[in-house]
Every structure is written in C-alpha cells, then in structure tokens.
Amino acid sequence: MRYITAGESHGEALIAVIEGLPSNLLIDEEFINKELKRRQGGYGRGGRMAIEEDKVHVLSGIRNGKTIGSPLTLEIINKDYENWKNKKTPEVTRPRPGHADLAGAIKYNQRDLRNILERSSARETAARVAVGSVAKLLLKELDIYVKSKVLEIGGVKAEEKWRRTIDEAKSKGDTLGGIIEIVIEGVPVGLGSHVQWDRKLDALLAYHVMSVQAIKAVEIGLGFEAARKPGSLVHDEIYYDEERGFYRKTNNAGGIEGGISNGSPIVIKAAMKPIPTLLKPLTSIDINTKEEVKAAYERSDVTAVEAAACVLEAVCAWVIADECLKKFGGDSIEELKKNYDAYLVYVKNF
C-alpha cells in the first residue's frame, strides 16, 4: 500500500489518497471521526481546536460502505478556511527557530514564509490520522490493535501534575514537549525481514514515527537503556509451551528481533520536542532586512503531546497493516484473512 496527503493548514481541505487497500473492507466513518476527535483533544491545545470539527468525507474507493479495490480518497474540510479565504495576510519574514520556516524558504526560494509554514504545519497530521484509522480497521480484521499513552509532559511523569505544568508554561509564554509510548498487540511473528536493510520492521516503524512533526527521537524496547546493560540483562530468553508455542517472559527487544516481529507486543517510545511557536518569541533574523528581530508568532498550542500520541498510533498502524498485506497478500479482505489464518496455523505447528 501507499498513501499521499495534500493540503495546507488554512487551505480549503486536507486530502489523503490510499492505494492498494483490499476490497470489501468496511470503512467505518464514525470510527475515523472518533479518531480525528481524539487528535483534537488534550489539555494545552490552542484556539484552532475551538474552530475545527474534523469529519472525514470519502470521495472515492467505496460502495455501500466497503472498499472496492480502487484508490480510497479521504477529505477533511478546514473550517478555519472561511476566516482566511478573503483575508489579505501580510508576508511572514521572521522565521521561527525550530520550525521549517527558514530552511524551507531557502530550499524553495520563497520570500513569504507562510508558503512554507502552511504545509509544514502539524495540521497535516489530521489527514494521517484518517489514513491510520483505515489501517486500524484493516488490522482489527486480524485482531491486531494499536494503543498509546503519554509518559511525560515537560519532563514531568506524574499525570496529576501535567495541567499545572502546562499552565505554568503558558503563563511564561513557553511550550512543552513530552514522551509517548505506543504498544501494538496481536502482531504475529514474521513481519519485516532481516535480508535487506530497508525491510527491517524496526527501521520502518522508526522512519514513520520520525516523520511526524516535532518527533526528535525514537526507542524500540529498552532502547538507549539497552546500551547501559550487559547482554545477560538485555536479551529475552526463549521458552516453549505446547499451547503458547515459543514465547518470552520479558520483552526488552520490544517485540522485534533482527528486523522481524517475534510475536511479543511491539513497544515504541517517541520523544516530542516543544512546539516552536512561542508566545514570547525567540531571537531571529528578518530574511529581508537581515536585522535581528523576534520570531513571528502564529496561533499555536502550548503542548500537543496527547494529540501526537494519536498521530503516532496512526503511522504505526499503517506500517503494520502494510507489512501484513506484503506478507499475506490478498486482493480482498476475505482472501487476506484466509491467508492470515493459515499462517497462524503454520506458526502454531512450527
């Protein structure tokens, strides 16, 4: 499978086109809309979330609620577009440290930074959540589920202190990042491969996780902690039971060994940096005058860690769904499930 997204933050709509879905997959629009609503939630979000009410509209690829094998096109209307379509906006010439503004302007020869920030905005992730929701619907057919939880916000692990931490940052005109854990349950042994670097499952997951705006680090299993311990305390010993088959009592590998899923839950941690748009802007340089200035301010969140958790679920669901289709094949959901069930029997009898 593959997908692309299109659209700008304050454009008329966001679009996603998914190619390669099997036919007869039920597209539950209510579920997709619930996922989109999750992305809009979380304490510390900005004023944009009071404007938008993200809903998916399927433009192509289904009949009677099910996929038909052709490209699936999803649309999400930007309600804020109505506030911008006739508005003459001044050029943005003061790049924000930590954002794509300056590097993007130089790369694409743009003197108005809005031409960069409109697409680089995390608003694009609404389209990816819609795509990931479709992937989740496919995985549900195989009893595979993706979930997440926020572990830290602004370096604070205690959930009951997060609101106060966010409020303090807001009062200072600052922003906060955090750490998110994603767990994928029900993944069979055998997704990914050791035979080529670009087929390794952990590499694919890390690539997609790092593609999400503001994500700066990723760990799988013990991650960096594995580098601090001897091998005897890191590697998961292997056991066998007639009912369970091969299994491990620990999961330091995070469900992946040698680039291949090993049947344990896949565990990923991702670090999100603070949002680059600060109410009290940092020092920058005006690209036209070359004078020292304060960076531009765009309406933004104090933190979006909880929203990012939903986005990370989506991109991880996409990777696992795509790998399932690569391994088990099937032009229809029925064929995919038949192949998958046969594989599970093979694994049980290995």
From Swiss-Prot:
Pathway: Metabolic intermediate biosynthesis; chorismate biosynthesis; chorismate from D-erythrose 4-phosphate and phosphoenolpyruvate: step 7/7. GO terms for biological process: amino acid biosynthetic process; aromatic amino acid family biosynthetic process; chorismate biosynthetic process. Pfam families: Chorismate_synt. Keywords: Amino-acid biosynthesis, Aromatic amino acid biosynthesis, FAD, Flavoprotein, FMN, Lyase, NADP. GO terms for molecular function: chorismate synthase activity; FMN binding. It is an enzyme of class 4 (lyase). It comes from Thermoanaerobacter pseudethanolicus (strain ATCC 33223 / 39E) (Clostridium thermohydrosulfuricum). Its EC number is 4.2.3.5. HAMAP family: Chorismate_synth. Belongs to the chorismate synthase family. InterPro entries: Chorismate_synth, Chorismate_synth_AroC_sf, Chorismate_synthase_CS. This is Chorismate synthase. Its cofactor is FMNH2. This reaction introduces a second double bond into the aromatic ring system. It catalyses: 5-O-(1-carboxyvinyl)-3-phosphoshikimate = chorismate + phosphate. GO terms for cellular component: cytosol. Homotetramer. Transmembrane segments: none annotated. NADP(+) binds at residues 39, 45. FMN binds at residues 119-121, 213-214, 258, 273-277, 299. The keyword NADP applies. Reduced FMN (FMNH(2)).
